[in-house]
A protein has these predicted regions:
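Conserved SAM-binding loop
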Residues: 6, 25, 137
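Glycine-rich FAD pyrophosphate-binding loop
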Residues: 1-21
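Conserved N-terminal helical subregion
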Residues: 29-168
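Short glycine-enriched, charge-decorated loop/helix-capping segments at active-site entrances
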Residues: 18-24, 72-76
Length: 173
């Protein structure tokens, strides 16, 4: 297969408490489980899942209404820890000799003439230029790769911000 190098801004979640109190669980559907099956991880993922048969709607008057996720109430979507899933995926990918991970590296831009990603090692302050046959930039809301594209001539885009804010809820068993 291809040689794959992953550069991640955050620290290695396998050695830090990256997700403690900062992330809500993911809802993984049948489609997501099929994807995990395709890469041989369905059983491991299912062991980490908590089935959710429906949702509870709370109105402003204090009334509640339980709504099943399926018409017959028999099918569930599954809740899974984002951190645990990421660790499983990283460990699985890292088990291949052609895959390597580099944590604490922030993408600060792209050199569109050479196709190189411009990275900053946030631990050492070292600047790196990384190239590959294909560069896939998934560097988030304040993307250095996107900023580089926006500065290029005749690049058209639109950007819309969602007005909602984030609210974390914690329910003790």
């Amino acid at each position: 297969g291809f040689k794959v190098e992953v550069y991640e801004r955050r620290p290695d979640p396998r050695t830090t408490d990256l997700y403690v109190g900062k992330s809500i669980n993911l809802a993984i559907s049948v489609r997501g489980l099929h994807a995990m099956k395709d890469v041989g991880l369905e059983d491991a993922v299912r062991e980490m899942c908590i089935p959710m048969n429906g949702r509870m709607i709370h109105d402003r008057q204090g009334n509640t209404d339980f709504q099943f996720y399926s018409k017959d109430g028999q099918k569930a979507i599954n809740s899974i820890s984002r951190g645990d899933l990421n660790i499983l995926l990283i460990n699985t990918a890292a088990s291949f000799p052609n895959v390597s991970f580099h944590f604490d590296h922030r993408c600060v831009g792209m050199d569109l003439d050479t196709g190189e990603a411009l990275l900053l090692n946030e631990k050492t302050g070292e600047n790196l230029r990384v190239s590959g046959q294909t560069v896939i930039a998934c560097d988030g809301a304040f993307s250095g790769a996107r900023a580089s594209l926006l500065r290029s001539p005749r690049f058209n885009f639109s950007q819309t911000y969602h007005p909602a804010s984030y609210k974390e809820l914690s329910f003790r068993p």
